């Protein structure tokens, strides 16, 4: 006779604390660039650099706090799948841009 018990070996869900930390960090990482843009007192270069850096930090916060990406034995396969997906997307976008710019260079000039 088969057992009715199920063994759950999947990665655990986050706690309320990890979601709260992720939310607070996300709000802070969004508010800083928003303030810099709305204030207008910062140089264009500093504003763009801050937006890019804090945007990348926010991506990492979302991956860790909300998507539960970690290097534990359960989460390692999710990380590997995510890395593979990022590589494929970068290849598709990069090679598409290469084809578009190459085609533009080969076009005859308009008279």
Curated annotation (Swiss-Prot):
GO cellular component terms, A-Z: cytochrome o ubiquinol oxidase complex; plasma membrane
Protein name: Cytochrome bo(3) ubiquinol oxidase subunit 4
Biological process annotations from GO: aerobic electron transport chain; electron transport coupled proton transport
SUBUNIT field: Heterooctamer of two A chains, two B chains, two C chains and two D chains.
Stated family: Belongs to the cytochrome c oxidase bacterial subunit 4 family.
Organism of this sequence: Pseudomonas aeruginosa (strain ATCC 15692 / DSM 22644 / CIP 104116 / JCM 14847 / LMG 12228 / 1C / PRS 101 / PAO1)
Annotated PANTHER family: CYTOCHROME BO(3) UBIQUINOL OXIDASE SUBUNIT 4
Classification via InterPro entries: Cyt_c_oxidase_su4_prok, Cyt_o_ubiqinol_oxidase_su4, Cytochrome_c_oxidase_bac_sub4
């Amino acid at each position: 006779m088969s057992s009715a018990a199920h063994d759950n070996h999947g990665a655990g869900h986050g706690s309320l604390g990890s979601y709260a930390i992720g939310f607070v960090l996300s709000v802070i990482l969004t508010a800083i660039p928003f303030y810099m843009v709305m204030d207008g007192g910062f140089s264009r270069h500093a504003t763009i650099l801050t937006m890019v850096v804090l945007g990348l930090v926010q991506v990492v916060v979302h991956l860790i706090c909300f998507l539960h990406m970690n290097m534990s034995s359960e989460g390692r396969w999710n990380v590997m799948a995510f890395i593979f997906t990022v590589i494929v997307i970068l290849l598709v976008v990069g090679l598409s841009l290469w084809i578009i710019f190459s085609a533009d260079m080969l076009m005859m000039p308009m008279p």
